[in-house]
From Swiss-Prot:
This is Superoxide dismutase [Mn] 3. It is an enzyme of class 1 (oxidoreductase). It comes from the Bacteria. It comes from Leptolyngbya boryana. It catalyses: 2 superoxide + 2 H(+) = H2O2 + O2. Residues 1-19 have a biased composition (Polar residues). One of its GO terms (cellular component) is cytoplasm. GO terms for molecular function: metal ion binding; superoxide dismutase activity.
Length: 239
């Protein structure tokens, strides 16, 4: 069944959209797109996610986004020279006959590339450093932030993601995106995000998305999230 999608929006002029977002130091290449290895064993995140879910999620779902993206770009040399981020920021420049394919699969590739990095078997606990201070300033305290983040993830109807972003005004904001849309499509820099597609949690949690959302905090990689927050902040300061 096809999924109705809202039209892609051209991002507003924003310092946050000119920086890579898959990695803090380099853009995500499309020539060709490649599946990144997991930075830990598939069973390493068992505090929140079982090994079989991780293997299926990474080896099958993420690989499918990569394969579909490369197929769509096979006869598009001009697009192959762009980063994934650049394509998603300006979807109107993508030929109409492959626009939704690029939106879904480039988005899926980007989202999951971020997702694997912001989790760690040594993660969890309270945030520290600059991101902790920013969360406290914006949301009052970490518990308030976590509650709002989980509520946004729980309220996402169907498939999608919940994100903490730095918006065009330099403020932290919780947003939810449908399907495989990424916050850069609206001019926001994704600091962290959780996948609320059923394939991310169903083997272990079935329909208990709230339990998954709660347990996920046990593997959140605050060191990487601090790196991402600082990268967004530095880019904004230079602009």
């Amino acid at each position: 069944a096809s999924t109705q999608q809202t039209p892609a929006q051209s991002p507003t002029a924003s310092p946050t959209v000119s920086t890579p977002v898959a990695y803090v130091d380099r853009p995500l290449t499309a020539s060709p797109a490649q599946l990144p290895p997991l930075p830990y064993d598939a069973g390493a995140l068992s505090k929140a996610i079982d090994a079989e879910t991780m293997r299926i999620h990474h080896d099958r779902h993420h690989q499918t986004y990569v394969d579909n993206l490369n197929t769509a770009l096979k006869d598009q040399p001009n697009l192959q020279n762009l980063s994934i981020e650049a394509m998603l920021r300006d979807l109107n420049a993508v030929p109409e006959n492959i626009r939704n394919t690029i939106r879904n699969n480039a988005g899926g590739h980007l989202n999951h590339t971020i997702f694997w990095q912001i989790m760690s078997p040594d993660g969890g606990g309270q945030p520290t450093g600059a991101i902790a201070q920013a969360i406290n300033q914006t949301f009052g305290n970490f518990e308030s932030f976590r509650k709002q983040f989980n509520e946004a993830g729980g309220d996402r109807f169907g498939s999608g993601w919940v994100w903490l972003v730095r918006n065009a005004q330099g403020q932290l904001q919780i947003v939810s995106t449908a399907n495989q849309d990424n916050p850069i499509m609206e001019g926001n820099y994704p600091i962290m995000g959780n996948d609320v597609w059923e394939h991310a949690y169903y083997l272990r949690y079935q329909n208990r998305r709230a339990d998954y959302l709660n347990n996920w905090w046990n593997v959140v990689n605050w060191n990487e999230i601090n790196r991402r927050f600082q990268a967004a902040s530095q880019q904004q300061a230079r602009s």
